[in-house]
C-alpha cells in the first residue's frame, strides 16, 4: 500500500452505490443539482456513513461558464444552446430515458428536455445535459455570482469542487483569473495562487 494512502473518490445516486460509498470511500461525489436536492443526499449519506462508524467528505461536479459580467456568461451559454439542434436533443433525451443510471435519470428530470426550463437554480444551468450524458449542469454567471454559488454549496457541506468547461483551457483561465481571487478573499480556498498547481483544496 502506498503511504500516504490516496483518498478514494466515488459517486453514485442509487441505493446500492450509496451503501458502498458509506462503507468504503473517503469522498462522496454528486453531480450538480439544485441545493435542496443535494442537501437531501448529503443528509442521507451522513446517516448511512454514521451507521458504519464513518464520516465522509463531500464533493460536487459542475461545468463552469464565467465572465466579468453575467450577461457575457449567459450569452455564451445561449450560444451553446443555439448549436444544439432539436433532433440532437430529442435523440439524447430518448437515450437517457432508457438508462439504468439513477444519476442520469436525476439529471434528465431537471429539465425534461424543455429548453425553456434550464436555469434550475440561480446561476445553475442544465443546458449541457440536453445532449451530454453524465454531469450536465454548469455554474453560469459573473465571477461574483459563481463564487456566491460555490459558497452556497460549500455551506451545504461540499468541500471538494470538480470543475470543467468548454473549452477546458479557456474556462480554467477565466475561473482562475476571476473567481479564485474572490474565493481566496473569502477564506474558502487553501493554497490557491495564480501559478499552476496540482491541487487546490476547498475548506
Regions found by a protein language model. Give the residues of each.
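An alpha-helical appendage that flanks or caps ligand/catalytic pockets
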Residues: 33-155, 184-203
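Structural motif
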Residues: 23-24, 156-157
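Glycine-rich, proline-tolerant flexible connector loops at the mouths of alpha/beta enzymes
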Residues: 32-36, 160-176
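Alpha-helical segments flanking ligand/cofactor-binding loops in enzyme cores
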Residues: 18-22, 151
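A local structural motif
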Residues: 3-7
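Hydrophobic faces of well-ordered beta-strands that scaffold small-molecule active sites
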Residues: 8-11, 26-30, 56-63, 161-164
